[in-house]
């Protein structure tokens, strides 16, 4: 059976899953989304993802036309309908169809879309051997303009930095904020290890509050590792003993080179490996 896509209470074959060309999600990137993983048929931290979705929607004055409980059920039903156990879920809420102007008050009912599929963001060898990344010249959105804490459908800021990375032969790129501090990568949060401590930029550096980021911080603290959410600059990354990225799609992936600087000994480090193991164990609980 073709992949089934959920759109506002109905299921459609992948080829027939359509929304209006007047939807402001398409015309202006006006909407919010979440990317989630399922392991063994269970969505990892579904409640946390839905809480973040609701926060993003509230921040842009978008009312999600169903309860969290109903949406959670729809996500699980869509997974089951497609027979997916270990997969990726893309949950989208658009503003709905409106006029060609910006006025969101002219939009009709918001559209809720659920896509369940499989994803492999990076090749297996990158998880085994580590990524090489570069710093993009594209600055992460200033929080006073469009907060990175809002997971909106407008990802052009990230895409521009992603293009820079790809043009440099890298699949991921590091983004700085307007103050020149390390923010995050185009689709992942960043961590470094220095002298046995785990360091990561704080939320007010202009980053998305990653669900996987939070999980890794919890795992590190449970393992008695000191975790500091502090301001970092590129120099801190260059001289780190280890570096890794986290994200729902990426999970936990090591970084072994940044801007041509070798991180540590150029191999995924012991802390990275241990936290990766702990994370994979957590997802199966």
PLM feature segments, named:
Residues 1-174, 178-181, 204, 208, ...:
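Conserved alpha/beta cores of soluble small-molecule-handling proteins
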């Amino acid at each position: 059976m073709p992949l089934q896509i959920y759109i506002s209470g109905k299921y459609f074959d992948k080829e027939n899953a359509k929304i209006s060309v007047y939807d402001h999600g398409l015309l202006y990137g006006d909407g919010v989304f979440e990317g989630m993983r399922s392991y063994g048929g269970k969505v990892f931290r579904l409640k946390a993802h839905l809480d973040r979705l609701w926060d993003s929607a509230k921040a842009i004055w978008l009312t999600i036309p169903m309860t969290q409980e109903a949406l959670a059920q729809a996500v699980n039903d869509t997974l089951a309908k497609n027979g997916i156990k270990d997969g990726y879920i893309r949950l989208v809420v658009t503003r709905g169809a409106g006029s060609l102007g910006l006025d969101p008050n002219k939009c009709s009912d918001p559209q809720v879309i659920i896509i369940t599929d499989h994803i492999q963001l990076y090749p297996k060898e990158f998880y085994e051997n580590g990524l090489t990344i570069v710093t993009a010249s594209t600055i992460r959105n200033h929080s006073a303009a469009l907060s990175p804490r809002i997971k909106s459908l407008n990802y052009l800021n990230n895409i521009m930095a992603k293009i820079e990375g790809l043009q440099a032969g890298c699949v991921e790129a590091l983004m700085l904020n307007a103050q020149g501090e390390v923010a995050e990568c185009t689709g992942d949060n960043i961590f470094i290890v220095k002298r046995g401590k785990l360091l990561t930029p704080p939320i007010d550096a202009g980053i998305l509050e990653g669900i996987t980021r939070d999980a890794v911080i919890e795992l590190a603290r449970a393992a008695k590792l000191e975790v500091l959410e502090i301001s970092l600059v590129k120099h801190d990354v260059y001289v780190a003993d280890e570096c890794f990225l986290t994200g729902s799609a990426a999970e936990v992936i090591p970084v072994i080179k940044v801007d041509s600087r070798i991180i540590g000994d150029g191999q995924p480090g012991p802390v990275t490996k241990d936290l990766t193991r702990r994370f994979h164990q957590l997802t199966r609980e």
